[in-house]
Amino acid sequence: MRKFFKYFLFIVVFLFHGFMFSVVNYVFPHYDVTRVTGVEVKRVDKDGPITKSNPADGPTRDVYYINTQNDDGKIMVYRNEDTRWGFPFYFKFGSANLQAEAQALGNDNKLVQIKYYGWRITMVDEYRNATSIKEITADDTPSNPIVSWILYVFLLATLFLSIQFIRGWFDSDK
């Protein structure tokens, strides 16, 4: 029974830390260096984009999209939507301004750095949300998500300490 409880605690610790790694990866900002190839706006409601087959049936909002392609040819689409006061707390209110800036940079085919959070999951139409965009040159060093790295190291340390604590707790009673 003690062995079962020990392995159960290991599983709980691994699941908790896996969840926390996922939260840090989703919520904290990342940076991509790319070129803007286009922008678009879609009117959506709670069911998704409004079309003939999906008419509006409630409050609607505009969702902006920024289409990009990096120098390797990889294409990525970013959602550009206000977070307002909601989670994650980026307090982003200027999506239209960011869209205009992206369009101007795309017209000039300039190299840009996009700061974003979230994941791109194609199967469920989940997009990364762009929070800022800035022009960079090929000589510039791209930004790095330092806070994320610090939290990853912290989570690895707590995972290691949790495992050592559980092992010590159960092995000391032999």
Curated annotation (Swiss-Prot):
Electron transport recorded as keyword: no
InterPro entries recorded: Phage_phiNM3_A0EWY4 (IPR011088)
Domain of life: Bacteria
GO cellular component, as recorded: plasma membrane
Keywords: Cell membrane, Membrane, Transmembrane, Transmembrane helix
Membrane topology (UniProt): Multi-pass membrane protein
Keyword Signal listed: no
Localisation per UniProt entry: Cell membrane
Principal location class: membrane
Membrane-spanning residues: 8-28, 146-166
This protein's name: Uncharacterized protein HI_0453
Biological source species: Haemophilus influenzae (strain ATCC 51907 / DSM 11121 / KW20 / Rd)
Taxonomic classification: Bacteria, Pseudomonadati, Pseudomonadota, Gammaproteobacteria, Pasteurellales
